[in-house]
Regions:
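Hydrophobic alpha-helical segments, principally membrane-spanning helices and signal/leader peptides
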Residues: 9-10, 51
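Bacterial N-terminal signal peptides
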Residues: 12-21
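N-terminal secretory signal peptides that target proteins for export/translocation
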Residues: 1-7
Length: 181
């Protein structure tokens, strides 16, 4: 095959590859209408040696369509929360994680759930399993739901922008909800 002929054959092949690269995103799958996030891991203890806590959510990022249903389930047999917070409230260091309590968002969420008496500061059984601070659905920081041990809950993601979440009981359990279309 001559050099000229191979160039003539390469040009249409290149055009087909470029067209395919442009067309594939146009046909890309939209975000799902429903998905599940799981609390997984365990706490282990060995006397005079260690306490190891591997509790976490099974995904760092969850993608879901606006108006979609997110199911949060627990297999750890521990209580958890799924709480929306501002991006800047997501802890990235041990100190930030510890500061979630006290004057941080974890205590604010505990008070909102009725798990801390705001007058005395004492812990108590939560009285409000679902906290919705704005319009109906999960759409802004402060929206929060409690997940009972071995239980599951469903929430509707109604906001259109990405959300950041953590467990107000175990603030190292955290992630992002990517809201798609």
């Amino acid at each position: 095959m001559t050099r000229r002929k191979s160039k003539r054959l390469a040009l249409p092949a290149l055009a087909v590859m470029i067209a395919a690269a442009v067309a594939v995103p146009a046909f890309a799958q939209t975000a799902p209408r429903s998905t599940t996030l799981r609390a997984v891991g365990e706490v282990t203890f060995k006397a005079n040696r260690y306490v190891k806590d591997s509790l976490r959510f099974n995904r760092d990022t969850v993608t879901i369509r606006k108006g979609g249903t997110l199911t949060i389930s627990d297999i750890t047999k521990q209580p958890h929360s799924f709480s929306l917070v501002k991006k800047g409230q997501i802890p990235r260091t041990m100190r930030q994680m510890e500061n979630c309590f006290g004057k941080g968002p974890c205590d604010d969420l505990a008070v909102a759930h009725g798990a801390i008496n705001p007058d005395t500061g004492e812990e108590q059984d939560p009285t409000t399993p679902l906290v919705n601070v704005g319009p109906a659905g999960f759409n802004q920081p402060g929206d929060s739901v409690l997940i009972p041990p071995s239980g599951k809950v469903k929430v509707k993601i109604t906001g259109s922008s990405d959300k950041y979440y953590l467990c107000a009981i175990h603030p190292w359990m955290l992630g992002k909800v990517k809201v798609g279309r």
